[in-house]
Swiss-Prot record:
Species assigned in the record: Xenopus laevis (African clawed frog)
Descriptive protein name: Gastrula zinc finger protein XlCGF62.1
GO molecular function, a single term: zinc ion binding
Function (record text): May be involved in transcriptional regulation.
Keyword Metal-binding belongs to the record: yes
Length: 169
């Protein structure tokens, strides 16, 4: 008998329990059967709903020993702790860039390596890989420069260009 006999027909991922496969399938279907009674937000998994409830109660029992910042669950504290250690355990197999959070790696792969640009500027028709990049691009049309150098007062449309500029001081 195979160790993981339950196989997702969508992606081929294997599971040892049928219920785990059933939960996994929600990542493909988008099914979100768990609903927050406070705000109506929906979740695919009960554990995510329970974690979300803490945002309403403001309960943050997990405290960083380095800086005192508090978190609603242990996993968020663990991710935060990497900001102190510099640990980046998630590596992009396409370019080797490392990330401290898996979801940021996934976003990177989608935005940089997929070639897809589904976010289209209504002003000029240019496509972008993420909503974030489109939002930044829109500033080229509006002239908005919300990122300001504290040394000289010069404004920039993106945080990236502000950091590039700061190296000149």
């Amino acid at each position: 008998i195979p160790e993981k006999p339950f196989i997702c027909t969508e992606c081929g991922k294997c599971f040892s329990e049928k219920r785990t496969l059933k939960h996994h399938i929600r990542t493909h279907t988008g099914e979100k059967p768990f609903i927050c009674t406070d705000c109506g937000k929906c979740f695919s998994f009960e554990i995510c709903l329970n974690r979300h409830y803490k945002t309403h109660t403001r309960e943050r029992p997990f405290i960083c020993t380095e800086c005192g910042k508090s978190f609603s669950d242990k996993s968020r504290l663990r991710v935060h702790h990497r900001s102190h250690t510099g640990e980046k355990p998630f590596t992009c197999t396409d370019c080797g860039k490392c990330f401290s959070v898996k979801s940021i790696l996934n976003h990177h792969r989608q935005a940089i390596h997929s070639g897809e640009k589904p976010f289209i500027c209504t002003e000029c028709g240019k496509g972008f890989a993420s909503k974030h990049y489109l939002h930044g691009h829109k500033r080229t049309h509006t002239g908005e420069k919300p990122f300001v150098c504290t040394e000289c007062g010069k404004g920039f449309a993106s945080n990236y260009y502000l950091h590039v500029h700061k190296r000149t001081h």
